[in-house]
């Protein structure tokens, strides 16, 4: 269920600004998106897992705040990130 180190490294290499980038909004949003999709799949099977559902809502809120931040900083970076991740806005 949790992301492995290899999965994190792969996501950070494709969405980070440089090789060791872990703190840029793009990298954080990409990692959160992967965690959200994994939790969504878990909740499809375990419908009554309300603790995980609350965690999912917290992750979605954190990602939404980061997306809002990047849209205010640079609209072009925001649009390319949304398109690459396949998110709707």
From Swiss-Prot:
| GO cellular component terms, A-Z | cytosolic small ribosomal subunit
Q: Which SUPFAM superfamilies match?
A: S15/NS1 RNA-binding domain
The UniProt entry, under Gene3D superfamilies, shows: 6.10.250.3130, S15/NS1, RNA-binding
* A GO biological process held by the record: translation
Q: Name one Pfam family in it.
A: Ribosomal_S15
Keywords, A to Z?
Ribonucleoprotein, Ribosomal protein, RNA-binding, rRNA-binding
Q: What InterPro entries is this protein classified in?
A: Ribosomal_uS15, Ribosomal_uS15_bac-type, uS15_NS1_RNA-bd_sf
An example molecular function term from Gene Ontology annotations: structural constituent of ribosome
Top-rank taxon of the source lineage equals Bacteria
Q: Which family does it belong to?
A: Belongs to the universal ribosomal protein uS15 family.
The record's listing under NCBIfam families reads: S15_bact
**Assembly and partners?**
Part of the 30S ribosomal subunit. Forms a bridge to the 50S subunit in the 70S ribosome, contacting the 23S rRNA.
Cited function: One of the primary rRNA binding proteins, it binds directly to 16S rRNA where it helps nucleate assembly of the platform of the 30S subunit by binding and bridging several RNA helices of the 16S rRNA.
Which named protein is this? Small ribosomal subunit protein uS15
Q: What is the organism field in this record? A: Mycobacterium marinum (strain ATCC BAA-535 / M)
